[in-house]
């Protein structure tokens, strides 16, 4: 079997965003292989859009008040799965992402895809090196660079929420990965529950 993949050519047309759900306070286009940081207050909304379809986006959230006290508290995938009773939250009753102190950080208000990943780390240098791609740009290094301005310690890996990443556990208890389900313009809308 031979598989021919199309070459990705980045053009401005691929990054035309759909109309926002409300007037944006901040609008950022995160180009592939990069990371952006931004601050929100409790009660504000975060809309993460896949403008091109079949892309993935790693998401971290910190509690600003804990950061001021020197505590780097981020979304905890294990706590979230435990409290929600599912692989990842969705709109409705079981809609929150929690930190390791069991505090709700963000709530899923709307999700047009319905398939994400809370089992895997954000991609790392080791992940790519093990596949033979030395020096490959990776999410962990991008996070480390972007978070320096907040005096957040660098890590070898980040336990991020991998939005639009199509991960499942099969009948043999094996993690499977497949093409993302997201189409151009699909999004997840979060409500911040912490600054």
Enumerate the language-model features and the residues they cover.
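Acidic, Ser/Thr/Pro
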Residues: 1-195
């Amino acid at each position: 079997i031979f598989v021919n993949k199309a070459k990705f050519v980045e053009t401005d047309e691929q990054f035309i965003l759909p109309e926002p759900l409300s007037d944006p306070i901040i609008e950022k286009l995160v180009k592939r292989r990069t990371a952006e940081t931004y601050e929100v207050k409790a009660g504000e909304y975060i809309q993460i859009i896949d403008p091109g379809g079949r892309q993935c986006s790693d998401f971290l959230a910190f509690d600003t008040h804990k950061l001021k006290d020197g505590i780097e508290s981020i979304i905890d995938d294990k706590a979230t799965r435990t409290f929600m009773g599912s692989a990842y939250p969705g709109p409705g009753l079981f809609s929150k992402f929690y930190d390791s102190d069991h505090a709700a950080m963000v709530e899923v208000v709307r999700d047009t895809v319905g398939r994400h990943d809370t089992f895997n780390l954000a991609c790392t240098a080791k992940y790519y090196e093990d596949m033979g791609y030395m020096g490959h740009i990776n999410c962990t290094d991008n996070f480390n660079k972007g978070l320096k301005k907040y005096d957040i310690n660098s890590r070898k890996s980040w336990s991020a929420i991998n939005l639009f990443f199509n991960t499942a556990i099969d009948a043999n208890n094996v993690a499977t990965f497949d093409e993302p389900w997201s189409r151009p313009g699909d999004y997840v809308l979060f409500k911040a529950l912490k600054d």
